[in-house]
Amino acid sequence: HAGGKFGDGGYSVSGGLHGVGISVVNALSSRVEVEVKRDGFIWTQQYKLGVPTAPVAKGAATTETGTTIQFWPSPDIFETTDFSFEVLSTRFREMAFLNRGLILSLTDLRPGHVDEKGEPLSVRYQFLGGITDFVKHLNSTRGELHKSVIALEAEDKKARISLEVS
């Protein structure tokens, strides 16, 4: 089961943006490669149409953490597998604003999808200020009323409620 495994309440703020989840992506992909850096090692596993092609492999030692998922949608299931880099990039940016401090990277490895230097299209988002950074982003193309963003935060761990306003 792949649902709701965000720490620090992240699942509650990303609920409308996370899509169908890795279980569905895995089942509908001709190939999925997962790399997880945790517990001091790099762990990898590959899948074909939702079925592991080998057991989880324990790789090299690392002090890093993070997860990389690559997938190839099955052309036998989908009429089109052409994705818009701009749409996905916007979605990743929105998720990064909502999950303060989370790093989200997107790289387009399709032939012909390159920048002016001939490199694959790639973006990396991390917003340490969360929704305050989102308001700053919105203000970057508009006139602002105040020099600094007015922001309030409150949390009641017992009631399992948190509030962020900017």
Sequence positions of predicted segments:
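GHKL (Bergerat-fold) ATPase N-terminal catalytic module, capturing the glycine-rich phosphate-binding loop
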Residues: 1-73, 78-79
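Broad gene-expression machinery/nucleic-acid interaction feature
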Residues: 29-31, 42, 66-68, 89, ...
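Generic, well-ordered alpha-helical scaffold segments in large soluble proteins
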Residues: 27-31, 91, 95, 137
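GHKL/Histidine-kinase-like ATPase module
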Residues: 86, 93-94, 101, 105-166
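Proteins with a high burden of low-complexity, intrinsically disordered sequence enriched in S/T/G/P/A and R
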Residues: 1-4, 70, 80-81, 154-166
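Conserved phosphate/pyrophosphate-binding and hydrolysis machinery centered on Walker-type P-loop NTPases
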Residues: 11-18, 78-85, 120-128
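Generic recognition of stable, solvent-exposed alpha-helical segments in well-folded globular domains
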Residues: 19-23, 27, 83, 87-90, ...
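ATP-binding catalytic core of ATPases
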Residues: 62-112
